[in-house]
């Protein structure tokens, strides 16, 4: 089923397939580097989102604004995924830039969540800055809600609420 849809998409948007293939190669290189850091690991997803979102631009100003928005949204998505998978990746010995970065720091779960939240907040501030420069014509109220409230609420849910729920269910977790 998905294969048929991919073929249709390839015919209509071949540049998107190229961008996604490039992401996969660059993501693999970033994660296999000798000393990967969080920004280096988030870069391929951020660059991919930038390229995809810029395709919607009608002029150079829109390209700049949408590029900034897409880049930092891609970075946020990568970081949120890594944050969400943190404990699972420790157990499965899977790659996770937060596990690598924080492995030798003796942090509590709350301290770790606050550190990651700070990185995400920096990223959200860049998303919001770019978003505020956009001329939104459709669905503005929905998009305002997503950018101004939804990103932060998702961070809270993943970084703090999930931990509290797990702690109350199984006892404290602090790998």
Residue positions per predicted region:
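Acidic catalytic motifs of isoprenoid enzymes
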Residues: 1-51, 55-68, 75, 79-109, ...
